[in-house]
C-alpha cells in the first residue's frame, strides 16, 4: 500500500566490467560490500530480479554482512514476497542488532508484516522502530535508497495496524502524530466508540496515505 522498502558507490573496475565486458560477472572477485552495493544500484533502477541475485551473492560471500540482508529484505518486498522479506530481516536481527542502519530493518519488517496482514507484528515492529529512533539527536529516518519513504510511512503503518486491531484510541494518537510531524495544524478528536467516529478515522488514514504517496 505504500511506495514500498547509502551507499550505492561501485568501484570503477567493477562498473567498467559490468558495462563493457559481457558475461564477466563471474570472472571478477568482488567483496561482499561491492556485491551489495551493485545490488542497490539495481534496486534503485527498479531491477529487482537482478538486485536479488547480487544481494544473494553478497550473502553467500559473507553471511554476517548486514547490508546484504537489508537489500534482500527490501527487494523481496518489491517482488511481492513479503514472507521472504520478513525471513531475511529477522534472520540477520537474530545474529546482530548493533549495526548503524537498524531502522531500515524495522521499517522493512513493519511494511512486510502489514502486507501479510499480520497487524500485531506490524505494530510491534513500528513500536520498536520508534523506540530506537531519536528525533532529538537526529532528523527523522528516511530510506537512503528511496528518499520518499520515511518515518511518517512507518507511523501510518502503525496507525493502520491499530485501526485493524480495534485499538482506536491508539490509532487516533498515531494519526495526530503524523499530522503534527508533517507540520499540519489538524487535530483529530473523534468519538471512536461510534461507527461514525471510526469511519472518520478510516477517512483520515486514507487521506494521509494519499498525501504521503504524493509527497
Where are these regions (language model features)?
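Register position in tetratricopeptide repeats
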Residues: 44-45, 78-79, 112-115, 164
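Start-of-helix register in tetratricopeptide repeats
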Residues: 33, 67, 74, 101-104, ...
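Terminal, low-structured helical/coil segments at or just beyond the last alpha-helical repeat
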Residues: 148-215
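Alpha-helical segment of the N-proximal tetratricopeptide repeat
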Residues: 30-57, 61
Amino acid at each position: 500500500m505504500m511506495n514500498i522498502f547509502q551507499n550505492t558507490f561501485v568501484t570503477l573496475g567493477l562498473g567498467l566490467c559490468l558495462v563493457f565486458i559481457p558475461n564477466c560477472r563471474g570472472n571478477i572477485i568482488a567483496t561482499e560490500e561491492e556485491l551489495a552495493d551493485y545490488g542497490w544500484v539495481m534496486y534503485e533502477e527498479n531491477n529487482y530480479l537482478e538486485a536479488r541475485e547480487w544481494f544473494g551473492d553478497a550473502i553467500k560471500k559473507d553471511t554476517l554482512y548486514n547490508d546484504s540482508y537489508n537489500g534482500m529484505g527490501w527487494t523481496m518486498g518489491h517482488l511481492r514476497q513479503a514472507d521472504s522479506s520478513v525471513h531475511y530481516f529477522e534472520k540477520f536481527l537474530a545474529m546482530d542488532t548493533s549495526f548503524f542502519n537498524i531502522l531500515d530493518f524495522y521499517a522493512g519488517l513493519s511494511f512486510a508484516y502489514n502486507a501479510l496482514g499480520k497487524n500485531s507484528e506490524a505494530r510491534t515492529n513500528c513500536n520498536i522502530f520508534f523506540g530506537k529512533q531519536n528525533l532529538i539527536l537526529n532528523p527523522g529516518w528516511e530510506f537512503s535508497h528511496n528518499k520518499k519513504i520515511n518515518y511518517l510511512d512507518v507511523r501510518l503503518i502503525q496507525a493502520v495496524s491499530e485501526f485493524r486491531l480495534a485499538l482506536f484510541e491508539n490509532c487516533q494518537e498515531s494519526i495526530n502524530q503524523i499530522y503534527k510531524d508533517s507540520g499540519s495544524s489538524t487535530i483529530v478528536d473523534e468519538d471512536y466508540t461510534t461507527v461514525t467516529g471510526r469511519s472518520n478515522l478510516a477517512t483520515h488514514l486514507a487521506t494521509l496515505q494519499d498525501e504521503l504517496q504524493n509527497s
